[in-house]
């Protein structure tokens, strides 16, 4: 197949404002030609499906990579929302005379598309992942949850990354997770604990972001599997170790071994083993 886009650096039409490879993050118009498309997607999701979106923007990859963030919800509702999201995006794209793809890696040598999964556990009205006295304001319960997900990360990939194309995305150098580790802001790690909002005022936002899943996966299976892995970590009190602040992409193999940082499966066959 081939991809044609007025935004792409290989465009021959001369009618757009092409972006260089991996230079598509938050561009302004006229380079970003898809703002009206995303606006329409957000309106349809909200008005016809009751799905609220936090924000939308152009993403790193060229040729029209977009991100629309769905507001958090209970697990089953969130999975329903993810499926509805795909349906809406594909149909609105058709109305705009375009084709939307959920392929994890449609363009070689450019960033792929993920389905980052954010999780928090609540007990009545209390977010059990929040503790103001702990590092990154992440509670011990939250640490154990991360430990469980890391413990089962290799097995999870068969569910979170179910196609051969999925593993074209999981390679170093494109902000995709490859290494089984956790951090506050490290995009080379599988787990991130967002920390840009701090304090008890934002306790409800404390969460774990699992960056491995991609949009080719089944969200019902992904959310269930990630939850099961995390709960296993809580049950067995699995420690995730220290958060990794350094860029793991730049570490040597010996440095990673010394730090106990393992890698995700390199292909679907290994994930299924």
Annotate each PLM feature.
Residues 1-273:
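Glycine-rich, acidic/polar active-site loops that bind/position phosphate-bearing ligands
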